[in-house]
A protein has these predicted regions:
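Membrane-proximal helix-turn-helix segments that form the acceptor-binding/catalytic region
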Residues: 101-116
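Conserved acidic donor-binding segment of nucleotide-sugar-dependent glycosyltransferases
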Residues: 262, 293-299, 309-313
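Short acidic active-site motifs
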Residues: 57-58, 82, 106-107, 200-201, ...
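A charged, aromatic-enriched C-terminal amphipathic alpha-helix characteristic of glycosyltransferases
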Residues: 30, 311-342
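Nucleotide-sugar donor-binding catalytic core of glycosyltransferases
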Residues: 1-57, 65, 72-77, 113-289
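Active-site proximal beta-strand in glycosyltransferases
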Residues: 86-100
Length: 347
């Protein structure tokens, strides 16, 4: 299959922050399939040539190469509606939307009509899109690329508890609460003093850790950054005023407090790690709690569960093995995309 893929290549448009989730999990997966011929024109290109020239390059490529599929992993306003409308006339076009639980109101629903199909991970997205007359929606879910995520051979599990991910005020509070309870947490990620972990370092941390955490607590209503998103929005690598859309931004703000499934539990289990995660959306449909993954309710419950599983190695290893087997069987992006392609009649 001939595919034109676009998405953000470098985190926040900054090469020093490393490659994005979509680069590791979607682009590399599609490229690795010998049946695919993938052309990659990342959003980052728009910073080099300008937004309009980047969109023209996409359209010219579609006209010249005649791909079977145009795949966009959406970020901000990189793609122009008129470009998408022309591409939609020429080939099957698909958008993967992240965070529809809060971005649907002020972002996704405006782009969705300009694609053949759009993909969402939120369990309630289809009914929300339907309120706006949008029906070209496929429900999928995060997963992991089994071609790059793997268990790493390490001398032993010398890290009791780890968290790999961006520092946010609510995550920092949980980490501090754990440390105050006597639990030493190894952290790496954007904005932490310890710094980011490279992709290979992250895989090593998953294997070295007895307990890997996925922290997705509800956003605080008083957090500065979420409040700022009522009045401002991201445009590629910039933050710009958005005073004209305060009403819909408010609706998005309140939706953002709903914990959602993230990719990390699939990545940890898919790498053979033992994962404790916060409850989110319909997580129980993807892993059996206490059998394949462990779910905590609040910080006190998290502290209790960490202490328990640090003391019960055999149970921890049984759960990690079951989680790995479930992830490898059902939650790879190969499985996710095969189902998407089936619905697109491209398999």
């Amino acid at each position: 299959m001939r595919i034109l893929f676009t998405g953000l290549e470098n985190e926040r448009y900054r090469p020093e922050l490393g490659k994005t989730n979509e680069h590791h999990n979607f682009y590399l997966l599609l490229k690795a399939d010998p049946k695919n011929d993938v052309t990659y024109i990342p959003f980052d290109r728009a910073l080099e040539v300008g937004k309009r020239a980047y969109n023209k390059e996409l359209l010219d490529t579609v006209r010249r190469e005649k791909p079977d599929l145009f795949w966009a992993f959406m970020y901000t306003d990189e793609l122009e509606y008129d470009t998408l409308d022309e591409i939609k006339k020429l080939t099957t076009s698909v958008a993967w939307f992240s965070d529809d639980h809060w971005r649907l109101e002020n972002y996704s629903r405006f782009y969705a009509p300009h694609f053949t199909k759009v993909i969402t991970t939120w369990s309630k997205a289809k009914e929300q899109y339907a309120k706006y007359g949008i029906t070209n929606v496929i429900r999928s879910q995060w997963g992991f690329n089994s071609g790059v995520y793997r268990s790493v051979v390490v001398p032993g599990q010398d890290i009791n508890v780890s968290f790999v991910g961006m520092r946010t005020p609510h995550r920092e509070k949980i980490i501090n609460d754990l440390r105050n309870a006597g639990i030493n947490v190894f952290v790496r990620g954007y904005k932490w003093d310890e710094g980011r972990a490279s992709f290979d370092e992250m895989l090593e941390i998953f294997s070295r850790s007895k307990v890997n955490l996925n922290l997705n607590p509800p956003m605080s209503a008083l957090a500065i950054k979420p409040l700022a998103q009522i009045f401002f929005r991201r445009r590629r690598n910039l933050i710009v005023p958005d005073f004209l859309h305060i009403s819909r931004n408010l609706r998005s703000f309140f939706q953002k407090r709903i914990p959602q499934i993230k990719a990390r539990p699939f990545e940890i289990t898919g790498s053979g790690g033992f994962c404790i995660t916060g409850s989110a959306d319909d997580m129980e449909n993807y892993f059996v709690p206490d059998k394949e993954i462990v779910i905590y309710k609040d910080t006190k419950d998290l502290i209790d569960k960490i202490r328990y599983y640090l003391e019960h190695e055999d149970e921890r290893r049984v759960i990690a093995k079951a989680g790995y087997e479930r992830a490898l069987k059902e939650h790879t992006y190969n499985a996710r995309l095969s189902e998407v392609f089936r619905q697109l009649e491209l398999d």
